[in-house]
């Protein structure tokens, strides 16, 4: 329904002819007659958008099977969260295959963009000290409650210095969608790495997005490795601290990526779609 509405006002329908007092050529409109299970729409989009017949970029978030199916069909970019590269590579492979084989899309036109939190320092020791300072400001005992709820266990069985009580965690229901995926990620990642509950909580706070700690060079190495090994196409950057996190990202990490030829030095397009490399895609109305 949404895409039909966006395409109901093609660029050539707007004639803006002052001499004839005609702004829109009604004969060129594409009225919508949509009836779905939950929504219905008729007529033409009532707002003249700046896109002029080019639909905005569609972003989909989620990693459940239903999200992968939906996103690979409709989205231009997929937001996701992965702590471990193998799971990221599996997700990447799945959605690219779905796009190509199930929906006959060019998989290069579907971007996979996981979230990441860079914690930067001029030296590795400085970066780790910054991360430790951020961790010290958290009330981990209070955070145990939400983790216990996610895992379906009593908070009393969560000892910060120990691993998760895997024998007490009941299997989650795939029908729970995002909740199921979140629990599976937490449990599988913690078990694979053998980390403590404290470490799980420090990661859980980021919504499952990966934290990369180090110098600009070290973080750039990590990020380019993920892209080069088909774990993602790029990243949705988050800042670790409001007062200077953005400055570290822009002044330290971006120049390092630019020096490696991995980040633009000027914009290629005047649109968000174009700067994602998606010009000429389905966003251009036929």
Regions found by a protein language model. Give the residues of each.
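Short, well-ordered loop/turn elements at secondary-structure boundaries
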Residues: 52-55, 65, 73-74, 107, ...
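C-terminal structured "cap/appendage" subdomains that terminate the fold
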Residues: 223-268
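Flexible loop/turn segments at secondary-structure boundaries
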Residues: 65-69, 85-89, 119-124, 241-247
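An alpha-helical appendage that flanks or caps ligand/catalytic pockets
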Residues: 1-53, 86-90, 96-227, 258-286
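Hydrophobic faces of well-ordered beta-strands that scaffold small-molecule active sites
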Residues: 57-61, 76-80, 110-117, 227, ...
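Short, acidic/polar
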Residues: 60-73, 215-228
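A conserved active-site cap/scaffold subdomain adjacent to cofactor or substrate pockets
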Residues: 69-84, 131
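Conserved, mostly hydrophobic/aromatic
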Residues: 2, 58, 71, 127, ...
């Amino acid at each position: 329904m949404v895409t039909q509405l966006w395409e109901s006002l093609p660029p050539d329908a707007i004639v803006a002819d002052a001499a004839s007092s005609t702004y829109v050529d009604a004969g060129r409109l594409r009225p919508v007659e949509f009836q779905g299970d939950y929504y219905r729409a008729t007529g033409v989009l009532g707002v003249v958008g700046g896109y002029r017949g080019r639909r905005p970029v569609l972003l989909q978030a989620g990693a459940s099977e239903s999200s992968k199916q939906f996103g690979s069909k409709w989205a231009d970019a997929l937001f996701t969260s992965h702590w471990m590269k193998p799971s990221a590579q599996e997700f990447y492979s799945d959605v690219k295959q779905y796009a190509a084989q199930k929906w006959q899309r060019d998989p290069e036109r579907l971007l996979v963009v996981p979230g990441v939190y860079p914690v930067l320092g001029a030296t590795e020791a400085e970066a780790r000290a910054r991360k430790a300072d951020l961790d010290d400001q958290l009330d981990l005992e209070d955070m145990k409650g939400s983790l216990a709820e996610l895992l379906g266990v009593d908070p009393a069985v969560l000892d910060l210095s120990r691993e998760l009580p895997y024998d007490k965690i009941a299997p989650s229901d795939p029908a729970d969608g995002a909740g199921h995926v979140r629990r599976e990620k937490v449990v599988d990642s913690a078990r694979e790495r053998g980390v403590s509950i404290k470490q799980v909580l420090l990661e859980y706070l980021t919504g499952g997005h990966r934290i990369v700690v180090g110098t600009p060079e070290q973080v750039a190495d990590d990020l380019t490795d993920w892209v080069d090994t088909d774990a993602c196409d790029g990243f949705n950057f988050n800042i670790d601290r409001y007062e200077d996190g953005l400055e570290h990202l822009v002044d330290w990490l971006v120049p390092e990526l630019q020096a490696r030829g991995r980040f633009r030095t000027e914009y290629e397009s005047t649109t968000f779609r174009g700067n994602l490399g998606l010009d000429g895609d389905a966003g251009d109305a036929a």
